[in-house]
Regions:
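N-terminal glycine-rich phosphate/adenylate-binding segment common to multiple enzyme folds
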Residues: 51-157, 245
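N-terminal beta-loop-helix "entrance" segment that forms/cooperates
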Residues: 34-60, 228-230
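Buried hydrophobic packing segments
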Residues: 24, 28, 206, 298-306, ...
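Short acidic loop-to-helix transition motifs that present clustered carboxylates
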Residues: 114, 221-228
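Glycine-rich phosphate/nucleotide-binding loop
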Residues: 50-52, 229-330
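Buried hydrophobic positions in well-ordered alpha/beta secondary-structure cores of metabolic enzymes
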Residues: 14-17, 71, 132, 174, ...
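Glycine-rich phosphate/pyrophosphate-binding loop and the adjoining helix
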Residues: 142-188, 192-196, 317, 321-354
């Protein structure tokens, strides 16, 4: 994905999303200026402010333009207490995730400095793995319902949807990623000992696909055991693939190993196709407008996007600059520094120019 102009839809969203995306955009504009990358940034006025102003959530014509003209989407964060039903957030997030079939939620869990590692006897080098979370199926699809609500006989059901197609493609993506990045081991985390139908499918398909990658070690782990191992020895993991629900849980545990959500980038990816990239953290309304938000997750996310667009050398470069910002304390308070959001962005951009 390297030929021609790359149009990037930019959706800052709500709360601190607008502040961290501003710094991500500055990084992109600097890369474009210095390296001559054919990038076109399309800034979209979507979020809680727009919804409260005129009721707009995610217009169909905007989605169609994204689908047909863009190479990537950079999203900040969505969520605002003035919109308790999250109507705008649901339309934007689900519209992109399902409309673009972004079936891989890819979450690098990389600790970039020893001082950020919370585990006794471990260092940053012990935490470097990537989680592939299935992103379009599972218990989050919303199948189910309630019966006799508000009574002593109330029943609530959520159904866990797993298709062979959905399971196989995210597992295959994890193996392909391991091959492409020189990793040697892929774990699949499930609860097939308890979820004997849905996760038996995961178990069976994982080892069927693994036969196509004899150069890789394919290992199964129950997700509860994985949580134990993550706080004992995270170095045992290189690539992990799991379902939607479990991926949501283990990646937040992973964020605790890398310095918090302010250090966690992510991609919602359809391999080889238009994909969406966002920092993991939320909109954090209490922090909005105070220049306190950590933009480094967004910088790392921009790096992931550059790899997706065909320039992996820029992800490596941005990762090293983030490492340098942490090492030199040119960072926000959540990771031990004293700088504000804008000043951290200034530091990263300055180092790019340096």
């Amino acid at each position: 994905m390297t030929s021609g102009t790359k149009k990037i839809a930019v959706i800052p969203g709500d709360g601190i999303g607008t502040e961290v995306v501003r710094e991500g955009v500055r990084v992109l504009e600097t890369l474009k200026e210095l390296r001559g990358y054919p990038l076109e940034l399309w800034h979209l006025d979507l979020g809680a402010d727009r919804y409260l102003r005129d009721g707009t959530t995610f217009p169909k014509e905007v989605f169609e333009t994204i689908r047909t003209e863009c190479s990537a989407v950079l999203l900040g964060a969505l969520g605002d207490p003035r919109v308790p039903g999250l109507e705008h957030a649901k339309d934007i997030l689900f519209g992109l995730r399902f409309g673009l079939d972004l079936y891989c939620n890819v979450r690098p869990v990389v600790c970039l400095a020893d001082r950020l590692m919370p585990l006794k006897g471990k260092t940053a080098k012990d935490c470097n793995f990537v989680v592939f979370r299935e992103n379009t199926e599972g218990i989050y699809v919303g199948m189910g319902g309630q019966f006799k609500r508000g009574t002593p006989d109330e029943i609530a059901i959520n159904e866990d949807l797993n298709t062979r197609k959905g399971v196989e493609r995210v597992i295959r993506a994890a193996f392909e990623f391991a091959v492409q990045t020189g990793r040697k081991r892929v774990h699949m985390a499930d609860k097939s000992n308890a979820m004997r139908h849905a996760h038996e499918l995961w178990y069976r398909v994982f080892f069927e696909v693994a036969k196509e990658y004899p150069q890789l070690e394919a290992k199964h782990v129950y997700v509860d055991a994985m949580c134990l191992y993550l706080v004992q020895d995270p170095s045992m993991f290189e690539v992990v693939v799991t379902c939607n629900l479990f991926g949501d849980i283990v990646t937040d545990l992973g964020a605790g190993l890398q310095g918090g959500l302010g250090m966690a980038g992510s991609g919602n990816i359809n391999p080889g196709k238009l994909s969406m990239f966002e920092p993991v953290h939320g909109s954090a309304p209490p922090l909005a407008g105070k220049d306190l938000a950590n933009p480094l997750a967004t910088v790392l996310t921009v790096g992931m996007m550059m790899t997706h667009l065909g320039w992996p050398e820029e992800e490596a470069r941005l990762t090293e600059l983030v490492r340098d910002a942490i090492d030199t304390m040119n960072c926000t308070a959540d990771v031990g520094g004293k700088l504000g959001t804008r000043a951290v962005g200034d530091y990263i951009v300055g180092r790019l120019r340096g």
